[in-house]
Amino acid sequence: MALSTFKREHIKKNLRNDEYDLVIIGGGITGAGIALDASERGMKVALVEMQDFAQGTSSRSTKLVHGGLRYLKQFQIGVVAETGKERAIVYENGPHVTTPEWMLLPMHKGGTFGKFSTSIGLGMYDRLAGVKKSERKKMLSKKETLAKEPLVKKEGLKGGGYYVEYRTDDARLTIEVMKRAAEKGAEIINYTKSEHFTYDKNQQVNGVKVIDKLTNENYTIKAKKVVNAAGPWVDDVRSGDYARNNKKLRLTKGVHVVIDQSKFPLGQAVYFDTEKDGRMIFAIPREGKAYVGTTDTFYDNIKSSPLTTQEDRDYLIDAINYMFPSVNVTDEDIESTWAGIRPLIYEEGKDPSEISRKDEIWEGKSGLLTIAGGKLTGYRHMAQDIVDLVSKRLKKDYGLTFSPCNTKGLAISGGDVGGSKNFDAFVEQKVDVAKGFGIDEDVARRLASKYGSNVDELFNIAQTSQYHDSKLPLEIYVELVYSIQQEMVYKPNDFLVRRSGKMYFNIKDVLDYKDAVIDIMADMLDYSPAQIEAYTEEVEQAIKEAQHGNNQPAVKE
């Protein structure tokens, strides 16, 4: 129970009393990766997140561990090579949260991709990214392309490219990395905001003053080194330090829409260019839905709640109807949406899609280290780079020595399944185990596929007598209880949006079972009447935002 909600007070006591080699500000995928790398090397690590884990950018992506095909168009050869290699590592270390997905790249007359350039480009991509033989590109005829996805626009179709991306659950990837870090000894807590830095007599950062957002308690965490990994908030965190460079972020917003497959019966993931501006977007089938995105526009508004506007929805609807003309999707067909912010490093005069997705490490005179930019796929390598630097500084300043990076072959929580090649056999073995507990085969398969080697804990929860009084289907009940016991879920939205993903991919379950979820959480976590009221309102607001978005301007007035 290393990341249990029931251990919050114990974790807070340790954070107050101990000194840490490294304190990390930010509980997205970047912070989680740093916590795992540093704790695996033997550092004493603490991490604070002001919201829930992955509540910012790390739950709002296209949910792909990209191989970096788009960077080939910009001739960023090194980025393609590194991204491809990292993608393979992410998959191998957690096949329960990342899975290969064949992607269709239709080629139309006058479109971005011609047959020759696509074949050359995908071939280069295979070589640079070290793609394994079974997943290397295929070039398809018009007939073969339509056989893969009959909904694709036939007019002007010349054929298609066929290559592999890796689909992931970004929020679950983050929490599984975080759980492994906690197992390695990292003290990790959410809903805890860094307010100020503390300094020693040489004006070097030696701690962080924080506030528990659930109880309004203030305390100080002592640290030898502090890393700012706050994603879109890195500039806000740095503003509390006296020593800053002239670097800054440029935020852009990306939006996705979700449509039921009864309306948009997409059977194949497709990567295609839009009619309006030639931007490449994805349409991906998942759990009986099709999701489509993303947009790319500058953003300067409330970072904690970027929303989908009507303009965003219209852009994606037009894109769907252009590439899949027979489906005739309308705004009413959109079940759910999400919007996320990309924390890109400012480059003057560049359009959103032109700004590099590279990451950088900034070191202030105060000793504060900031990691900015970057991509979901590169989280492990980003962590390695900055923890290497932390290790050097700790050796120089304190004479401490730590082992080198060891995360390349380190399974994340739930990833102890015997490697990606054994994963399907592992799932079937767990389905057989579940039969002995009387758990439905489909439910068992979904749970084993989602939770990997942690699934036995969910099967055990299914045997408890409390389930029968819960008014929840077994699958939702065991996921909810597990997320409280093992994944530091405190608020209903932590579960409904991020741990389960239901707010995006099964909003009907949210509407049907939200009250029962709140009842169980209120009982297990001893909510006050005021908390029940506040958290119920938060759920209703999240539903409203997912279903309708609003006309929030990109730039606040």
Swiss-Prot record:
One of its GO terms (molecular function) is glycerol-3-phosphate dehydrogenase (quinone) activity. The keyword Iron does not apply. One of its GO terms (biological process) is glycerol catabolic process. The keyword Calcium does not apply. It is an enzyme of class 1 (oxidoreductase). It is found in: Cytoplasm. SUPFAM superfamilies: FAD-linked reductases, C-terminal domain (SSF54373), FAD/NAD(P)-binding domain (SSF51905). GO terms for cellular component: cytoplasm. InterPro entries: DAO_C, DAO_C_sf, FAD-dep_OxRdtase, FAD/NAD-bd_sf, G3P_DH_FAD-dep. Keywords: Cytoplasm, FAD, Flavoprotein, Glycerol metabolism, Oxidoreductase. Its EC number is 1.1.5.3. FAD binds at residues 21-49. Its main location: cytoplasm. Pathway: Polyol metabolism; glycerol degradation via glycerol kinase pathway; glycerone phosphate from sn-glycerol 3-phosphate (aerobic route): step 1/1. Its cofactor is FAD. It holds the Pfam family DAO. It catalyses: a quinone + sn-glycerol 3-phosphate = dihydroxyacetone phosphate + a quinol. Belongs to the FAD-dependent glycerol-3-phosphate dehydrogenase family. This is Aerobic glycerol-3-phosphate dehydrogenase. The lineage of its organism: Bacteria, Bacillati, Bacillota, Bacilli, Bacillales.
